[in-house]
């Protein structure tokens, strides 16, 4: 099948997602200022172990290639390893994201022994100063310790996942060198105004000149650096980058959240993009097949094509950027058929000037340890000891829930 034909098939939707993101829990030991799911505290309605296994059975029947497991911090679920083992035993590969808190020497050996599990360590700076400013004091050291354990265990090719901000764009070469030193692969992702990122996006997202710097750097690295579907909005600078150069929401990807709700995109956790629940009749398969939202997203008009096309359809670069990221537009208050807020031609920046941030949609749920926006602190470190990341145990209620699920 030719590449254009394959892209067309992706846009029309597949019988099953190529992969899906599954947030196992909102519990997390950190309070990252840009967390897409506003994680921190566990939701008592979380899927039980038995319900999670039912979802895995469905994914096996649908022949889903693999699942991206995240959170929160997924490894703090007491049944995390049980679910990973169950998935791989049922031909569903697992890639999970972690801040490294539970990746000790024993866990690293366990991971290195599996052919069907991949791990990516979240790290948002090549130095502790830059990383800890957004991920919290001590998080850099935790990630490095996890990477040391993985390297010592012989786990080759694990991923280092970096959310690009205006503060770490200048560290691209350092980040690549860090990944190379561990025999790891660097993965860069776009900062979206989702979750707590809605409060910090304007402070953190790369500026126009940095976007061009990022594009040129990625273009020169080819497939050495993974990007997923993060940067297709930059394609008008000179052509598509390696990766998925289209919005796959509801077509080839989607999200299952900790309580079983299914959203079109991991970055669009809002009732506007809620497709259903794995707890409803027919489970996940019925949601993927029959959701009215997914059917709408798979229509050509929903992508800005045809007579019903949006404002971007007349742009000469539309075939390159496809109008950009749905979630980025939605949570900055821009119309879905208009330009991406980081449109390389500047149309998004102009649209943002006219948009009212007060009326922009807010993320649906907030499980943060704090209820107020968390300021971004880039600069000299305070002289005193860091404050506690949270004043309550993020695992509260886990023991009882785990025993009920057996």
Where do the protein language model's features map onto the residues?
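Conserved alpha-helical substructure of the radical SAM core
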Residues: 1-118
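Short beta->alpha junction loops/turns
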Residues: 25, 40, 73, 100-101, ...
């Amino acid at each position: 099948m030719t590449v254009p034909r394959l892209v067309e098939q992706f846009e029309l939707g597949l019988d099953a997602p190529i992969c899906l993101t599954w947030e196992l829990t909102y519990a997390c030991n950190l309070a990252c200022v840009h967390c897409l799911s506003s994680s921190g505290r566990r939701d008592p309605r979380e899927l039980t172990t038995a319900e999670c296994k039912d979802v895995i059975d469905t994914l096996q029947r649908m022949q889903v290639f693999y699942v991206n497991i995240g959170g929160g911090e997924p490894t703090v679920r007491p049944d995390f390893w049980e679910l990973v083992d169950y998935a791989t035993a049922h031909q569903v590969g697992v890639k999970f994201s972690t801040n490294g808190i539970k990746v000790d020497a024993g866990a690293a050996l366990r991971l290195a022994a599996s052919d069907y599990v991949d791990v990516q360590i979240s790290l948002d700076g090549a130095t502790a100063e830059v990383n800890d400013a957004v991920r919290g004091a001590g998080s850099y050291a935790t990630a490095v310790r996890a990477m040391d354990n993985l390297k010592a265990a012989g786990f080759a090719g694990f991923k280092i996942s970096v959310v690009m901000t205006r503060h770490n764009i200048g560290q691209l070469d350092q980040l690549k060198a860090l990944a190379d030193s561990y025999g790891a692969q660097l993965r860069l992702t776009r900062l979206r105004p989702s979750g707590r990122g809605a409060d910090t996006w304007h402070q953190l997202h790369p500026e126009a000149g940095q976007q061009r710097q990022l594009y040129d750097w990625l273009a020169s690295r080819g497939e050495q650096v993974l990007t997923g579907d993060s940067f297709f909005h930059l394609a008008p600078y000179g052509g598509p980058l390696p990766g998925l150069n289209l919005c796959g929401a509801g077509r080839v990807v989607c999200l299952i959240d900790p309580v079983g709700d299914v959203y079109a995109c991991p970055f669009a956790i809002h009732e506007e993009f809620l497709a259903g629940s794995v707890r409803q009749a027919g489970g996940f398969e019925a949601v993927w097949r029959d959701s009215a939202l997914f059917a709408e997203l798979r229509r050509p008009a929903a992508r800005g094509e045809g007579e019903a096309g949006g404002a971007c359809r007349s742009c000469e670069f539309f075939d390159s950027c496809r109008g950009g990221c749905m979630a980025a537009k939605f949570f900055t208050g821009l119309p879905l058929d208009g330009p991406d807020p980081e449109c390389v031609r500047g149309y998004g920046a102009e649209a943002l000037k006219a948009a009212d941030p007060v009326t922009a949609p807010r993320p649906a749920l907030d499980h943060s340890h704090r209820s107020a926006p968390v300021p971004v602190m880039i600069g000299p470190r305070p002289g005193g000891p860091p404050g506690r990341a949270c004043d309550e145990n993020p695992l509260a209620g886990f023991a009882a829930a785990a025993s009920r699920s057996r």
